[in-house]
Regions:
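Assembly/oligomerization scaffold segments
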Residues: 1-134, 190-193, 202-210, 215, ...
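Intrinsically disordered, low-complexity segments enriched in Gly and acidic/Ser/Thr residues
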Residues: 281-299
Length: 359
């Protein structure tokens, strides 16, 4: 969740607010009065009904702009949202909230406006991966290489050696009682699967570490997994959510390493709960044990939620809490879509199996 000043935070949660959007490239700034409307899509899973290890999804914006003179196609823009200061008509507290760095991939003029589709650099990742580095090599080198080819900065920190902890903050220890550190996430990429794409390779590298990948607000490629709740939603700002009757709970994982090798941990009987199944030719027993200690038991409700007062501080993969006064529900944001037209609203969802599918 992005952090802002107290004055901006208070205004975000107020019904008395006006938003503006801004596009900025190296040569110009397209100001808010020309951006008529916009809508975004972002997700941490490529599946329609389940969370996913190793999902690497691009984010995008569709915009309507009252500017038919500018050539947008192929240009890269830093995108911002800001609140209007009613006293000065300027930017409240001088704070612009970065929403990402996007390339214009489609541009269509109609009347006095132009419709744009803006996407982050992962949009181009479905091309075959041709290494620009010697192979075999370490996973970090492969991830760096793909990011360079896509025009991204790798925002994942491999240099900081730190204790690994589970979702409750407990230290992770292997079966021999040895404390695990982040540096153990280095592993060798010995060869490449036939016709593998850059997106698929990033997916393998992410799922091996129990994460998904995306491009953050600053145009950097990062990985994460769902953590603790970052905010309790104000019931005055949302419509009543649609919630599944039962929780989804991860009880096991199954990884297909090759046609001849499959690794698993936990319960593999799908009638007992959610069993995450995925493929990764680089998975090892130690990597699987490490990621299982962090994601095993993770639970959530399938949720659809309309946030009337959209909050641009939320990031994909954040966890928010909904409470009805009696019960509280943690909601991992797997899908996040903003709608801007001077106001700002958001559709938030946590995908998962329906009640019928859980039986």
């Amino acid at each position: 969740m992005y952090t802002v000043s107290d004055i901006v935070s208070s205004k975000i949660e107020s019904y008395c607010r006006t938003w503006r959007m801004e596009l900025e490239d190296t040569n110009s700034i397209l100001t808010g009065d020309k951006i008529v409307s916009a809508s975004s899509t972002a997700q941490s899973t490529s599946l329609s009904d389940d969370i996913e290890l190793g999902a690497v999804c691009s984010q995008s914006w569709n915009m309507t702009i009252s500017d038919t003179e500018t050539a947008f196609l192929g240009k890269e823009y830093d995108t911002y949202l800001y609140l209007v200061d009613y006293e000065t008509s300027g930017i409240l507290a001088g704070e612009k909230i970065p929403m990402g760095r996007f390339t214009c991939v489609k541009s269509k003029k109609s009347g006095g406006s132009v419709q744009l589709t803006m996407a982050d650099r992962l949009y181009f990742s479905d091309k075959p991966y041709v290494p620009h580095i010697p192979m075999p090599n370490w996973n970090k080198a492969v991830e760096d290489d793909i990011c360079r080819q896509l025009g991204l900065q790798n925002g994942n920190d491999y240099t900081e050696v730190r204790l690994l902890r589970d979702k409750n903050g407990r230290r992770l220890i292997d079966k021999n009682g040895k404390v695990l550190y982040s540096k153990y996430f280095y592993f060798k990429v010995s060869s490449l699967p036939k016709d593998v794409t850059m997106r698929q390779m990033l997916s393998y590298l992410a799922s091996a570490q129990g994460q998904f990948g995306y491009v953050d607000r600053y145009g950097k490629y990062v990985r994460k997994w769902y953590g603790k709740s970052v905010k309790t939603l104000d019931n005055n700002t949302i419509d009543l959510p649609t919630l599944s009757e039962r929780q989804n709970a991860i009880v096991g994982i199954i990884c297909k390493v090759s046609d001849d090798e499959t690794l698993s941990l936990g319960v593999t009987d799908t009638t007992q709960g959610r069993v995450l199944e995925f493929e990764n030719p680089y998975m090892t027993e130690s990597l699987l044990q490490s990621l299982w200690r962090r994601i095993g038991g993770f639970s959530w409700y399938t949720t659809e939620l309309y946030h009337r007062l959209g909050d641009p501080r939320f990031d994909i993969g954040d966890v928010v809490t909904y409470t009805n006064g009696a019960d509280s529900y943690d909601i991992p944001i797997t899908n996040l879509g903003f709608t801007f037209d001077g106001g700002l609203s958001a559709d938030i969802s946590a995908v998962g199996l329906s009640v019928e599918e859980q039986l």
